[in-house]
A protein has these predicted regions:
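Patatin-like phospholipase
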Residues: 1-42, 50-260
Length: 260
């Protein structure tokens, strides 16, 4: 067991556009005086996490990322290693990130990615930010792997979609936001839809396996009604994360755990 050197750790799952719900989750916590001392995120959680760690508020980030169209985030490419490019997200990070390295961030951050050469989860916490956040967000089939030091990396959700591992032994309290509930889908059409669905199904096991490690874990079931590649509902997703978290924070057992 490591020394619990941080008071509160935030853990943010992957989930594509559903990650806007993370921002509502954080907004509700902030209103109750709960701020992260360290953050661990995968994919969309890495994107939200790096901007929070850089000093932006949840509503700042909502405004920054709420562009309205998936084409503002990603572009079709020749399907050699991936169907899409994350060029829009890279552009947003280049334009807005004040920190250039993990060491420059205001809050310590872990970013989970999958080393596909060695078949394992990797938790980045040092060096260049943008390439490692991009690696964490590179959904297989949809996006090309990111090569760092001759190793190919894909989305952290392949191996760890709720990355509590880096912080579970060093935080007194851990709160988490999971945005990947999966419900019934009647029909899937097109390669991108099938790839998206397959990836999401692989990630659902995380909540049941790890729920006991959290003092508060928010996983709004209504998120199953939103696609992971459709950012058009950003305001709705933010509100869903916010309202679900506010409701959870009215529970006296949770309030005692969080010293509220």
């Amino acid at each position: 067991m490591g020394e619990k050197i941080y008071d509160t750790g935030f853990v943010l799952s992957g989930g594509g556009a559903r990650g806007f719900a993370h921002l509502g989750f954080i907004e509700a916590l902030n209103e109750n005086g709960i701020y992260p001392d360290i953050i661990s995120g995968t994919s969309a959680g890495a994107l939200a996490g790096v901007l929070i760690a850089d000093g932006y508020s949840p509503r700042d980030i909502l405004k920054m990322l709420n562009l309205g169209s998936r084409l503002d985030f990603m572009r079709p490419t020749l399907p050699r290693e991936g169907l899409l490019q994350i060029s829009g997200i890279i552009k947003i990070l280049n334009a807005n990130l004040r920190a250039k390295s993990f060491e420059d961030l205001k809050i310590p951050l872990y970013v989970a990615a999958t080393d596909i050469n060695n078949g394992k989860a990797v938790y980045f916490s040092e060096g260049d930010l943008i390439e490692k956040v991009t690696a964490s967000m590179s959904i297989p089939v949809l996006f090309q792997p990111v090569v760092i030091s001759n190793i190919q990396y894909l989305d952290g959700g392949i191996t760890d979609n709720l990355p509590v591992t880096p912080v579970e032994n060093i935080c007194k309290k851990i709160v988490g936001s999971f945005v990947n509930p999966v419900g019934y889908v009647e029909k899937l059409t097109g390669l991108i839809s099938i790839a998206e669905r397959t990836f999401m199904l692989n990630m659902t096991k995380e909540v049941t396996e790890k729920a006991g490690k959290f003092d508060l874990l928010v996983a709004p079931p209504e998120l199953r009604n939103y696609g992971i590649l459709d950012p058009e509902k950003a305001e709705e997703l933010f509100a869903l994360g916010y309202n679900t978290t506010k409701a959870k924070l009215r529970d006296e057992t949770i309030r005692r755990k969080l010293d509220l």
